[in-house]
Amino acid sequence: MMNKYEMIIHWSEEDQLFIAEVPELPGCMADGHSYQEAVSNAVIMINEWIETAKDLGRTIPKPKGKLMYA
């Protein structure tokens, strides 16, 4: 599933992993040994976050799509 949520990806010296955070979805983050793996894992976590929110009847924020203009 394609999504348009903004991701912030950075290297963690402490964990020796790339960390991908999704600020628009509280608590949604993933990691990976490569940049691409972190992004791929974040996409999975976004989809799981949305499915869980639906199951719990919670509001799902609309993506702001900031990166579309970068």
Predicted features by range, described:
Residues 26-37:
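A short, exposed loop/beta-hairpin motif centered on an aromatic-Gly-Thr core
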Residues 24-27, 62-64:
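Hydrophobic residues in alpha-helical membrane-spanning segments
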Residues 1-6, 40-70:
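Short, charged, surface-exposed hinge/linker loops at domain edges
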Residues 10-25:
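Short aromatic-glycine-(Arg/Gly/Cys) micro-motifs in beta-strand/loop hairpins
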